[in-house]
Amino acid sequence: MAKTPENIAIDQLDKDQIKTFSDFLMSYNKLSETCFTDCIRDFTTRDVKDSEEKCSLNCMEKYLKMNQRVSQRFQEFQVIAHENALAMAQKTGKL
């Protein structure tokens, strides 16, 4: 049975959502591993020490701020690249 354009669009949307969620999980796992490795040192007790908790929170905050800043810069460069491509297309008469 042939797929309709609507079904193809839904399949692509599902793939995009799965990719987005997969990227989120990879980022979350990287954050968890990095902060755990950097901050947790004492395995002789079940309790999390205040210093470990503070370090983990600082690590998480720094990572999230860095991720936000990289995303902002990426968006800025995308806008510039789009404007440059548009200007080039206008200059060459392809628009």
Curated annotation (Swiss-Prot):
InterPro entries attached to this UniProt entry: Mito_inner_translocase_sub (IPR050673), Tim10-like (IPR004217), Tim10-like_dom_sf (IPR035427)
A single GO BP: protein insertion into mitochondrial inner membrane
Disulfide bonds: 35-59, 39-55
GO molecular function, one term: unfolded protein binding
GO cellular component entries: mitochondrial intermembrane space protein transporter complex; TIM22 mitochondrial import inner membrane insertion complex
Highest taxon listed in the record's lineage: Eukaryota
Pfam families noted in UniProt: zf-Tim10_DDP
Family listed: Belongs to the small Tim family.
Function: Mitochondrial intermembrane chaperone that participates in the import and insertion of multi-pass transmembrane proteins into the mitochondrial inner membrane. May also be required for the transfer of beta-barrel precursors from the TOM complex to the sorting and assembly machinery (SAM complex) of the outer membrane. Acts as a chaperone-like protein that protects the hydrophobic precursors from aggregation and guide them through the mitochondrial intermembrane space.
Summary of subunit composition and partner proteins: Heterohexamer; composed of 3 copies of Tim9 and 3 copies of Tim10, named soluble 70 kDa complex. The complex associates with the Tim22 component of the TIM22 complex. Interacts with multi-pass transmembrane proteins in transit.
Entry domain remark: The twin CX3C motif contains 4 conserved Cys residues that form 2 disulfide bonds in the mitochondrial intermembrane space. However, during the transit of Tim9 from cytoplasm into mitochondrion, the Cys residues probably coordinate zinc, thereby preventing folding and allowing its transfer across mitochondrial outer membrane.
Name the record gives this protein: Mitochondrial import inner membrane translocase subunit Tim9
Species assigned in the record: Drosophila melanogaster
Annotated gene: Tim9a
